Amino acid sequence: MHPDDNYALSVEGEYGKTEMWYVVDCEDGAELVYGFKENISKEEFEKRIRDNTLTDVCNSIPVHKGDVFFIDAGTLHAIGEGILIAEVQQNSNTTYRVSDYGRLGADGKPRELHIEKALDVTKCEKPQIPYGNIGKVISNGNIIIRELVVCDKFSAKLLKLNETMDICSEDSFVSLIILEGNVIIKCNDGEISIRKGDSIFIPAGLKVELCGNAEILYSCV
């Protein structure tokens, strides 16, 4: 999990991390961990970490393509096998591990765990934030917009583009990830072509035109 800004700034000297996952694709039966099944105490959390029974109380959720998970700072989480996600997050590398599933680092040794810090920051309540196929859908001509997440750290939406769309954000940069299809981006006298799997950074105040048929993950701060 990741700490919030207050804890991370005081202990690590950098910001914490809130993030969002969008499931781009997944295998049948794939699951991820999102918080706990039910509320638990800090004491039980610590005991289960140390006796290696933490997975018994983790909230393992079957996922589907297009699902959305808002991972607020302090939420226990882990991506399971067979899942491809696009992640929107705060710019921070602070992560506290309580289990690494027996994996080894590049040096062949177990990676460091951060149990004491995790006990300080982990939310031991069952998550109450909706997840899955969520988000208000707005149709605007040839564009369908699905609002995924709006918080004080970032906002994210899914764009289904069928023809053209102008983008210009005065207050923030814009990040675009092409999930499906192909897009031509026109700006001033030039243009570039991007396709599935590509991402592009658009500076604040720059007006661009998107042309094509595509599914796009749009995020800004």
Question: Which residues make up each language-model segment?
Answer:
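Conserved residues at beta->alpha junctions
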Residues: 36, 73, 204
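Short small/polar-residue motifs
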Residues: 142-143, 203-207
